[in-house]
Amino acid sequence: MSEQQTVSQKEQYNLNKLQKRLRRNVGQAIADFNMIEEGDRIMVCLSGGKDSYTMLEILRNLQQSAPVNFSLVAVNLDQKQPGFPEHILPAYLESLGVEYQIVEENTYSIVKDKIPEGKTTCSLCSRLRRGILYRTATELGATKIALGHHRDDILQTLFLNMFYGGKLKGMPPKLMSDDGKHVVIRPLAYCREKDIERFSVAKGFPIIPCNLCGSQPNLQRQVIGDMLRDWDKRYPGRLETMFSAMQNVVPSHLSDYNLFDFKGIHHGSEVVDGGDLAFDREDIPMQPIGWQPEDADDAAPVRLDVLEIK
């Protein structure tokens, strides 16, 4: 066997292992939050980025073995940004045989008219996009809207709200849309961004850049993202533990009196959630909860090749 064949087999082995992990993560999230039910028609929001490509690929894969029957329709919103490569997504989706719809709405002009030059346009753009996607879901008869946010996005949102909004509020894996008509799901909620990056590189997805509009990045989100990546590098397992904490909330040991009846505590009341542990030395596990050591091959650096738009 040649060296090239050996490398190819090794790469395929690592890809298969990575895909199994992503499948397991997505399948677990779907089960935990009852994201997909019998007969669902899932509208998969496809932006052309690594996350939405991965979401579509894993959902297509799960379709073949899921205990329930569901259908997929991929939807991309062409917002008429200058230089947007209109041919990329149709060609890719047709090659897969996936049902799809390209929705053309010139929100770019609206945003440029309303937002001063050099300011972040993402907030207004996302509101406009959300309304169009809700309308499209109704037109397509979709029962669920699938978005490509992953675990790291959820943690970023938690810290953004803590640091800048004064709230313990993250990004739910499943919710009712703000128009009260659609169920929104995030199948990648348990998936790590670095796994998605590796998978995207290995699969060779035709990535479309997200900054065609020329908008400046959200500085706060960028700072939080850099902080989390630094923690993940310096303290392996920290992100896993923080995400586990989001699923293990103890309201009686926080300070929100709307979530727990502190006023109702009197002499003779029952001990709740272990009472006061402030004076005890807590048993802290040697390894962070949820952490698993990575294989050397899994930890290889990656670089996403983005299509050059001319």
Curated annotation (Swiss-Prot):
Pfam families: ATP_bind_3
S-S bridge residues: none
Pathways involved: tRNA modification
Catalytic activity: cytidine(32) in tRNA + S-sulfanyl-L-cysteinyl-[cysteine desulfurase] + AH2 + ATP = 2-thiocytidine(32) in tRNA + L-cysteinyl-[cysteine desulfurase] + A + AMP + diphosphate + H(+)
Required cofactor names: Mg(2+); [4Fe-4S] cluster
Cited CDD domains: TtcA-like
Localization: Cytoplasm
GO biological process, one term: tRNA thio-modification
Residues that, per the record, bind [4Fe-4S] cluster: 122, 125, 213
Record-level Gene Ontology MF annotations: 4 iron, 4 sulfur cluster binding; ATP binding; magnesium ion binding; sulfurtransferase activity; tRNA binding
Keyword terms of this UniProt record: 4Fe-4S, ATP-binding, Cytoplasm, Iron, Iron-sulfur, Magnesium, Metal-binding, Nucleotide-binding, RNA-binding, Transferase, tRNA processing, tRNA-binding
Assembly: Homodimer.
Record family assignment: Belongs to the TtcA family.
Additional observations: The thiolation reaction likely consists of two steps: a first activation step by ATP to form an adenylated intermediate of the target base of tRNA, and a second nucleophilic substitution step of the sulfur (S) atom supplied by the hydrosulfide attached to the Fe-S cluster.
NCBIfam families: PRK10696.1
Functional description taken from the UniProt entry: Catalyzes the ATP-dependent 2-thiolation of cytidine in position 32 of tRNA, to form 2-thiocytidine (s(2)C32). The sulfur atoms are provided by the cysteine/cysteine desulfurase (IscS) system.
Protein name: tRNA-cytidine(32) 2-sulfurtransferase
